[in-house]
From Swiss-Prot:
GO MF terms held by the record: DNA binding
HAMAP family xrefs: SfsA
Family to which the UniProt record says this protein belongs: Belongs to the SfsA family.
Pfam families: SfsA (PF03749), SfsA_N (PF17746)
Organism listed in the record: Pseudomonas savastanoi pv. phaseolicola (strain 1448A / Race 6) (Pseudomonas syringae pv. phaseolicola (strain 1448A / Race 6))
InterPro entries per UniProt: SfsA, SfsA_C, SfsA_N
Transmembrane parts of this sequence: none
Signal peptide: none
Name by which UniProt lists this protein: Sugar fermentation stimulation protein homolog
Amino acid sequence: MRFAPQLEQGRLLIRYKRFLADIETDSGELLTIHCPNTGSMLNCMMPGGRVWFSRSSDPKRKLPGTWEISETPQGRLACINTGRANTLVEEALRAGVISELEGFTTLKREVAYGQEKSRVDFRLEYPDGYLYLEVKSVTLGFDDSSVAAFPDAVTQRGARHLRELATLAREGVRAVLLYCVNLTGIDAVRPAKEIDPVYAAALREAIDAGVQILAYGVHLTPDEIVIDRRLQVHWLD
């Protein structure tokens, strides 16, 4: 996926009210832009840090742009726009990059399912069956470590999705959770038990129920982002 229009660069001043960020562009322009991320963004919102944003040409839009990429304190690039993850995964699925899920004949997005009335990111249909696929965008990294972690904030919604997937797996339905690690310089991902122990416990229960866990990393520059490799998944028991 190439970023279009071309991203512009600036420096972060402050993120506030969750969905807003003040930045200064390289040309000295002061802007308030949309922050498309509900997490804590622990290592992605350092004041003074480099950011890249897409500028909107829609005159009716209240904010002039959307925050897309941050440079982390570790010097990595992180795509903080969580809305990109599902598009990236769909591109990778259709290109056959995610080999574990190859062979589907139909792909459906945002399908209602489960006892808790959730919506799963993808339903893939095969000649001999189907599966449900939930995607999580990962941007949390640490100093001197190539292992990313999820989540970066307590996520009741994430735990609910795991419960739904676990229920499906117990019923004999193939259920898959895929971590899309939108952070450069990463080789593996793990549950952030120190941030959300409830989510970590739900993940262990989902694995025990038969939910398949996958993780894939990206090639990311200010010009493009694409899923390009499988990553390891580390557990904290």
